[in-house]
UniProtKB/Swiss-Prot annotation:
Transfers the 4'-phosphopantetheine moiety from coenzyme A to a Ser of an acyl-carrier-protein. Activates the peptidyl carrier protein (PCP) domains of surfactin synthas. GO terms for biological process: lysine biosynthetic process via aminoadipic acid. One of its GO terms (molecular function) is magnesium ion binding. PANTHER family: L-AMINOADIPATE-SEMIALDEHYDE DEHYDROGENASE-PHOSPHOPANTETHEINYL TRANSFERASE, PHOSPHOPANTETHEINE TRANSFERASE. Gene3D superfamilies: 4'-phosphopantetheinyl transferase domain. One of its GO terms (cellular component) is cytosol. This is 4'-phosphopantetheinyl transferase pptA. Belongs to the P-Pant transferase superfamily. Keywords: Transferase. It catalyses: apo-[ACP] + CoA = holo-[ACP] + adenosine 3',5'-bisphosphate + H(+).
Length: 263
C-alpha cells in the first residue's frame, strides 16, 4: 500500500494551470468540478481526479482507455479492463493536502477494501480542545468510545492530545471509506487504542486489516493520516507507512507532470 500526498497552495497554483488541466478528466467530472463556488475547492477536486489517472498512466494505460465508475454509496473505482494486478485506490483531502492511497486489489471488488483519510492537526476556532472533544463525544453525537475519550483527554500536553484525537479519527474514517460506507456508520463500533496500537470492531480485533499511519507537514501545519486495507488473515497490523511508500508533491509540479503524461 502506498500514498501520494499533493500539497496545494492556491498562491502557487495559477488559474491557467487549472484551465489547462481540466480537459484531462472526462466531461462528467469536469461538470462536477465546475460546480464548486470556490476555485480552491475546484482545484482540490481536479487534483483528486487526476491522481488515479496518473497512476493508471504509470501502469501503461492510455488516457482514452481509462474508465471509472462509482459504487451505490458513491465510492469511485477503476473499471479499466485488463489491469493486472487489479488496482484499489481511494482519495481524500483536508485543507492543503490531497492524498491518494493505492494498492493491489485483492479482496472486496469492484472498489476493493481500501480507504484513506488525512486531517490537519488543529482545533476549530473559538473553542477549546476539551470542548472540541465534547462536541464529537456527547450523547447527541457520540463518536468516541469511553476508552478513546479517556486517552485523548488524559493529562498530557495539548499537542499530543490533538495528535491522539486525529489518529483515532482518521483511522475510523479510513476504515469506513475502505468498506465503501457513506455517512451514518456508528463510529463507536470502531475503537482505536493509540496507546496499545489496537483496533477493535464491535469489541473484536479487526482481523485481516492493515492500518498504515503517515504524517505530512506544510508551511508550519502538521497533518496525520491513515490508510486502511483489508487483506485477510487473522492478525490486524497497525504500523507507520514504510519509508518510500509516502511520496509528496507540490500541486503545481504534479499537475504539470500530469498534463505531460496524459497527453
Amino acid at each position: 500500500m502506498q500514498v501520494w500526498a499533493i500539497i496545494y497552495d492556491k498562491a502557487d497554483f495559477p488559474d491557467t494551470l487549472y484551465q489547462n488541466a481540466l480537459p484531462f478528466v472526462d466531461q462528467a467530472v469536469q461538470s462536477k468540478i465546475k460546480r464548486f463556488h470556490r476555485r480552491e475547492d475546484a482545484c482540490r477536486s481536479l487534483i483528486g481526479s487526476l491522481l488515479p489517472r496518473v497512476l493508471l498512466r504509470k501502469r501503461g494505460v492510455s488516457r482514452d482507455e481509462m474508465t471509472f465508475a462509482t459504487t451505490e454509496n458513491g465510492k469511485p473505482y477503476c473499471t479499466t479492463p485488463d489491469i493486472d494486478p487489479p488496482l484499489g485506490f481511494n482519495v481524500t483531502h483536508d485543507e492543503s493536502v490531497i492524498a491518494m492511497a493505492f494498492g493491489s486489489g485483492d479482496l472486496g471488488p469492484p472498489a476493493y477494501n481500501l480507504g484513506v483519510d488525512v486531517m490537519q492537526l488543529k482545533v476549530p476556532p473559538r473553542i477549546t480542545f476539551s470542548e472540541f472533544v465534547d462536541s464529537v463525544s456527547s450523547q447527541e453525537s457520540d463518536q468516541l468510545t469511553a476508552r478513546e475519550r479517556n486517552i485523548v483527554l488524559a493529562d498530557i500536553p495539548e499537542g499530543e492530545a490533538l495528535r491522539r484525537f486525529y489518529w483515532v479519527w482518521t483511522l475510523k474514517e479510513a476504515y469506513t471509506k475502505a468498506l465503501g460506507i457513506g455517512l451514518g456508520f456508528d463510529f463507536r463500533r470502531i475503537q482505536y487504542d493509540v496507546l496499545e496500537e489496537k483496533v477493535t470492531i464491535d469489541g473484536e480485533l479487526a482481523r485481516g486489516w492493515q492500518f498504515r499511519k503517515f504524517e505530512v507537514a506544510h508551511s508550519g501545519n502538521k497533518y496525520v493520516g491513515v490508510a486502511a486495507r483489508f487483506v485477510g488473515g487473522r492478525n490486524p497490523s497497525i504500523t507507520d507507512l514504510d519509508e518510500g511508500s509516502l511520496v509528496c508533491y507540490d500541486a503545481a509540479s504534479f499537475v504539470n507532470r500530469a498534463i505531460e503524461e496524459l497527453v
